[in-house]
Amino acid sequence: MTRVGFKSHKGMKRESNEDSCFILPQEGVFIVADGVGGHNSGQTASGMAVSEIAEMIKQKPIRKRKENSILKYLESCVEAANIRIIHRAIEAPENVGMATTLVMSYINGNKAYFANAGDSRAYIFRDGELRQI
């Protein structure tokens, strides 16, 4: 059984929280993005990354992929989100420099696949032990 949770906190140094998440448990999809603090529009970037990937997965579910193409598909989702963020930054000067980190996973049976951008990390909690992936 897979159990997940999400808790977000702005931390001690930030004025705002720039985290975004998306979970689709029935599809085994979990995404967390953290807008880069100190840059313009971090919250916008994290929200865009999560929504772009969520839409891609809703339109073209991962479960329909062959096992040997899953990681490539996850990579293409992250790349599409990155391109969308870059275009938004070009279109609107107030967004110049906006950025986000992201980690996502797809869990299918006893296998888990991960993709990330930046320094966001994934962890597994098993048998009372938290381990970085």
Label the model's feature ranges.
Residues 1-133:
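PP2C/PPM-type serine/threonine phosphatase catalytic domain
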